[in-house]
Amino acid sequence: MSTTDENLICIITAFWQLVNTVFWYSAIAVYCTTGMKIITVTGYKGGVAKSTTSVHLATYFSDKGKTVLLDGDPNRTAIAWSERGDNKMPFIAVDQRQAVKFVTGSDYIIIDTPARPDSDDLKELAKGCDLMILPTAPDVLSLQPMLEIAKDLGATKANFRALVTIVPPHPSTEGKQMRDELELGGVPVFKTTIRRTVGFPKAALAGVPIRDLDDARLRIAWADYQNLGKEIEELLK
């Protein structure tokens, strides 16, 4: 084990003992191995496909290298998703207590945080990752909170992007309207949007990513996350 790996283990262990997940996440970045990329998925409220996004980004990046999904959500949604499929996911899903064993030597770490972090927590989370993703539903009630969050993060010069999720199917224009409003408000936002589909709950129930469901109609939903993954790769270069 390298000195860097030993340092990483020590810092994770120490911060877990403090039982402060926000600062624990930030600490990972301090001693991460060269080339490791940390992507944090967080949201100011629940029900915005945060864990769905974490699971499918972990699936995407598992084709690029060793990927670990750190599930910090008290509901353990990502871990439960994986366990329902007998842990046959192409990535490793663990909580903070298991991270010491699995995180070293990873190429990608996807962090699924608790929902509703406050402004200070968001800033700390942003310091501890290479990219922060903020899923948001395409509705007017989500717009103002996202503008306020972006203002707070913009002051820290953090690398973050909003992601419009749960987008209704054509002919609805809600997804495009939300993207346009975010851009007008100065919020960096992904070009890719994630459409709403019954396939995601089915995948969660089966314990697999949506790409593994035997339904050709759902391939377009997986394509959304493939396109998102490609955007992220460009941002992390």
Model-derived features: where do they sit?
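Switch II (G3) loop of P-loop NTPases
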Residues: 103-122
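P-loop NTPase switch/communication element
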Residues: 74-90
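Inter-motif core of Ras-like GTPase G domains
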Residues: 120-139
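Beta-strand-loop-alpha "switch" segments that mediate conformational coupling across diverse proteins
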Residues: 178-211
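Walker A/P-loop phosphate-binding motif and the immediately C-terminal alpha-helix
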Residues: 35-74, 106
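Inter-lobe coupling/hinge region of RecA-like P-loop helicase motors
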Residues: 203-226
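G-domain G4 guanine-recognition motif of GTPases
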Residues: 137, 161-175, 192-203
